[in-house]
């Protein structure tokens, strides 16, 4: 996919409008995690260094359009950004009449979700945003799967529309992983439900050499292979779909390596007693909460030989120590592998952080829903608009 990049633009003396994703957790005016704010810095600093003035826009939470409340304000975000940039960043609520800026200034439009028509991708609002700038930059991969005025309409009407540092890196990494992957391509798709990831499983079935499934998804696949899973979380009504995915992968020489040994417990709790069992020995009162060491070893060997690894979801209840070993083994194997690795999704990122391998994953995706939709092969509207403007 071709699109213009911020790093290729001439910016001196220009007004640059950047759609960032600074939707951070805020409680009583205090930011809980500023990762997304820091992730936006490369694009902002690039513009400032080039002699531009910068206008930022982002959403925060889920406010009601046209009804501003104090808790919906970006003031805490602007404060934190001011600290990181070591310069004042003002929040501008009344920007429609224009903004007075000089080179080196950074300002932030108030929460875009307060603007009427934002979520409906209103053309008039998009034109109003576009009228503020010489160059529009989308640097918010996390919202790329939504067509909204601050991600889509604005890109249609701005004089120039391009991808920021973060978005360009994200698209390059995803393209490298899925559009022209080094083989073997190994995908790890785990989670509690097949139903939420079924379209991803179906889309990947045509592409991957090995599809590793985990969690409730693996239990449904074990059912599809005629195994007893006791009272484990699974979706019996989707066994047919699981069988189709397995058949599809095996038809082109790929495989779905299912666990041969598992860690079970009588209940789902932090204090549940864990027991290692062969899959064939699972009884009706067992809950499968992790893969066993033999299965983990097999998966680690698959990952070691991979050319590309795409990881979405832990293979066990890693939050509980006794059920964390499968995910730990897998995380460490990915970290040690020479493969190009990309990981995304909240639980996956938590697992990566817990096991201390963050710096050894080739690329960590910032987008939850957008990452999943890219895996599904869906067009991301905000990215498609950048491509149309290239």
Swiss-Prot record:
Keyword Cytoplasm listed: yes
EC number: 2.7.2.3
Keyword vocabulary terms for this entry: ATP-binding, Cytoplasm, Glycolysis, Kinase, Nucleotide-binding, Transferase
Coiled-coil region: none
GO cellular component, one term: cytosol
Catalyses which reaction(s): (2R)-3-phosphoglycerate + ATP = (2R)-3-phospho-glyceroyl phosphate + ADP
Annotated binding of ATP, by residue: 197, 319, 345-348
Residues annotated as binding substrate: 21-23, 36, 59-62, 113, 146
Superkingdom per UniProt: Bacteria
InterPro entries: Phosphoglycerate_kinase (IPR001576), Phosphoglycerate_kinase_CS (IPR015911), Phosphoglycerate_kinase_N (IPR015824), Phosphoglycerate_kinase_sf (IPR036043)
Biological-process GO terms, alphabetical: gluconeogenesis; glycolytic process
Major localization class: cytoplasm
GO molecular function terms noted in the UniProt entry: ADP binding; ATP binding; phosphoglycerate kinase activity
Keyword Transport: no
Pathway, per record: Carbohydrate degradation; glycolysis; pyruvate from D-glyceraldehyde 3-phosphate: step 2/5
Location within or outside the cell: Cytoplasm
Assembly information from the UniProt record: Monomer.
Family: Belongs to the phosphoglycerate kinase family.
Name of the protein: Phosphoglycerate kinase
């Amino acid at each position: 996919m071709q699109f213009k990049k911020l790093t290729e633009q001439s910016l001196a003396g220009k007004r640059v409008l950047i759609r960032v994703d600074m939707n951070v957790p805020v409680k009583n005016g205090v930011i809980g995690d500023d990762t997304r704010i820091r992730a936006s810095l490369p694009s902002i600093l690039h513009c400032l260094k080039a002699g531009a003035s910068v206008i930022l826009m982002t959403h925060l939470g889920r406010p009601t359009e046209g009804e501003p409340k104090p808790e919906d304000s970006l003031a805490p975000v602007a404060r934190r950004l001011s600290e990181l940039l070591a310069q004042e960043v003002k929040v501008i609520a009344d920007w429609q009449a224009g903004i007075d800026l000089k080179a080196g200034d950074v300002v932030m439009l108030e929460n875009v979700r307060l603007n009427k028509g934002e979520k409906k991708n209103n053309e008039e609002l998009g034109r109003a945003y576009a009228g503020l700038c010489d160059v529009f930059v989308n640097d918010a991969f996390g919202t790329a799967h939504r067509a909204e005025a601050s991600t889509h309409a604005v890109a249609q009407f701005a004089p120039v529309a391009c991808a920021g540092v973060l978005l360009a890196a994200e698209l390059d990494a995803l393209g490298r992983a899925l559009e022209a992957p080094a083989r073997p391509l190994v995908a790890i798709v785990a989670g509690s439900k097949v139903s939420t990831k079924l379209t991803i499983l179906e889309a990947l079935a045509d592409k991957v050499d090995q599809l590793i499934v985990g969690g409730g998804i693996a239990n449904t696949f074990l059912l599809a292979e005629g195994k007893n899973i006791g009272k484990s979380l699974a979706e019996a009504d989707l066994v047919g779909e699981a069988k189709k995915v397995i058949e599809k992968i095996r038809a082109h020489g790929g495989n779905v390596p299912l666990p041969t040994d598992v860690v079970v417990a009588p209940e789902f709790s932090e204090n549940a007693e864990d027991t290692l069992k062969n899959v064939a020995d699972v009884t009706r009162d067992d809950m499968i909460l992790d893969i066993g060491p033999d299965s983990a070893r097999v998966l680690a060997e698959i990952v070691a030989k991979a050319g590309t690894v795409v990881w979405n979801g832990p293979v066990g209840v890693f939050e509980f120590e006794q059920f964390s070993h499968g995910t730990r083994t897998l995380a460490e194997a990915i970290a040690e592998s020479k493969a190009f690795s990309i990981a995304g999704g909240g639980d996956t990122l938590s697992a990566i952080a817990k096991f201390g391998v963050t710096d050894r994953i080739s690329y960590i995706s910032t987008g939850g829903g957008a990452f999943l939709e890219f895996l599904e092969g869906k067009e991301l509207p905000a990215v498609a608009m950048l491509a149309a403007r290239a």
